[in-house]
Amino acid sequence: MSKKKGLSLEEKRSRMMEIFFETKDVFQLKDIEKIAPKSKGITPMSVKEVLQSLVDDNMVDTERVGTSNYYWAFPSKALHARKRRLEELEKQLEDGSQRKKALQQAVDKAKVGREVNEEREDLLKELTALKGQRDQMKVEIEKYQECDPAVVEEIRNANIAAKEAVARWTGGTFGNYLISYLLTCSLTRQEPWAHHLSPSSGFSPGTACQTCYYYQQAIS
């Protein structure tokens, strides 16, 4: 034979409440410890624990008289206790429903504008195209950095250094004139210096061939 299954806590609580309802009497703990095992099958070791759980839930009343504690519970008391408990559960259910509704509204609001549609796809394509144009403009800006004042100043300083180097080579007034001319052409026309030494530029160095030679050596 299989071993008989013991009572659950709720079953013990229910059977102990039957003791109070059937007798409509007041008991001490020692009285319940005698009655519960015999009439309701509640183990003696669990009587005190079950009784205290009923007191904690306001299903059983208790009062200390002298050195003894007395316990009682009437059907009307249990009815009111169950009614209060039912009201608490209904309130919790209502609060939970309201919370669920608020969360669902928040979720629906968050979804607005994220649904996939033709207009959204077109906007995404336009955004991608604009990003591509932005990247292309960055490349173009890098190409025109020569027009930046800082870059021009850097070129000017390099030209001055080159002029001084050529002056050291030529050591003459004509060399300075030649370099000044070339510097002016380079900055205003943004063309290489060597271009202004060619015959097509209209410049005729004449007897300054040696000077031109030193100049080309200096800038090469």
UniProtKB/Swiss-Prot annotation:
* Gene Ontology cellular component annotations, sorted alphabetically: nucleus
InterPro entries from the UniProt entry: Mnd1 (IPR005647), Mnd1_HTH (IPR040453), WH_DNA-bd_sf (IPR036390)
Write out the annotated subcellular location.
Nucleus
Cytoplasm among keywords: no
GO BP annotation list:
reciprocal meiotic recombination
Q: Which GO terms describe its molecular function?
A: double-stranded DNA binding
Coiled-coil ranges (or none): 76-147
Which domain of life does this protein belong to? Eukaryota
**Signal peptide residue numbers:** none
Which UniProt keywords are present, listed alphabetically? Coiled coil, DNA recombination, Meiosis, Nucleus
Q: State the PANTHER family in the record.
A: MEIOTIC NUCLEAR DIVISION PROTEIN 1 HOMOLOG
State the protein's purpose: Required for proper homologous chromosome pairing and efficient cross-over and intragenic recombination during meiosis. Stimulates both DMC1- and RAD51-mediated homologous strand assimilation, which is required for the resolution of meiotic double-strand breaks.
Family indicated by similarity: Belongs to the MND1 family.
Name it: Meiotic nuclear division protein 1 homolog
Q: Which organism is it from?
A: Danio rerio (Zebrafish)
